[in-house]
């Protein structure tokens, strides 16, 4: 994410909320939050989203196009086969798509969306949070710095506090 980017985040669960917070911390000009749950969209606003789109009734592709020719970066964090295909239609020519959500079903990609990769010369990237090589990796250094300084606020994700012994019941 570069200063001034326009970013779309599809799926506003924990991964999406953090993607929104990081986008704003890195200087995104406008962040679109896309979800089917109004409560999650309100959380997305608290994490810095500028435009909230409930895709239950609105085509998020058409809605984003009202603001220009597409975003610089589209992040798929829902892990939904439907959105995994549709996210390819959000970036402008030369834009990026990052897949962070993990689908638990096959992802059929209609020809229109698959062609967006070639016709728009998209950069498609997968992201997986794990330890990098060589051990110890440095991927958490920035996270600790940004969270510790308050540039990225994670406290909004805390909705309940329970005793450790109650943990198994929560799941």
Predicted regions and their residues:
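Mid-domain Rossmann-like dinucleotide-binding core that forms the NAD(H)/NADP(H) cofactor-binding site
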Residues: 1-57, 62
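Glycine-centered, small-residue-biased loops immediately flanking beta-strands
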Residues: 5, 95-96, 122
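Short acidic-hydrophobic, aromatic-tinged amphipathic segments that line or gate anion-handling sites
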Residues: 51-56, 159-166
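A short acidic, Gly/Pro-enriched loop at the edge of an enzyme's catalytic core
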Residues: 63-74
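Beta-loop-alpha module in the N-terminal Rossmann-like domain of NAD(P)-dependent dehydrogenases
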Residues: 77-85
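Helix-to-beta-strand junctions that scaffold the AdoMet/dcAdoMet cofactor pocket
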Residues: 91-93
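Acidic carboxylate diad motif detector
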Residues: 100-101
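C-terminal substrate-binding/catalytic core of Rossmann-like NAD(P)-dependent dehydrogenases/reductases
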Residues: 107-160, 168-169
């Amino acid at each position: 994410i570069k200063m001034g980017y326009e970013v779309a985040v599809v799926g506003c669960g924990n991964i999406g909320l953090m993607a929104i917070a990081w986008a704003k911390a890195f200087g995104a000009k406008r962040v679109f939050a896309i979800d089917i749950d109004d409560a999650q969209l309100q959380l997305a606003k608290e994490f810095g989203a500028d435009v909230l789109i409930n895709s239950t009734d609105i085509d998020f592709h058409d809605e984003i196009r009202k603001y220009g020719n597409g975003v610089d970066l589209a992040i798929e964090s829902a892990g939904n086969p439907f959105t995994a295909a549709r996210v390819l239609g959000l970036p402008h020519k030369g834009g990026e798509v990052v897949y962070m959500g993990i689908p638990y079903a096959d992802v059929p990609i209609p020809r229109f969306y698959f062609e967006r990769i070639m016709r728009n010369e998209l950069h498609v990237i997968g992201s997986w949070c794990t330890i990098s090589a060589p051990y110890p990796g440095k991927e958490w250094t920035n996270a600790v710095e940004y969270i510790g300084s308050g540039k990225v606020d994670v406290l909004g994700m805390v909705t309940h506090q329970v005793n450790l012994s109650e943990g198994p019941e929560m799941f």
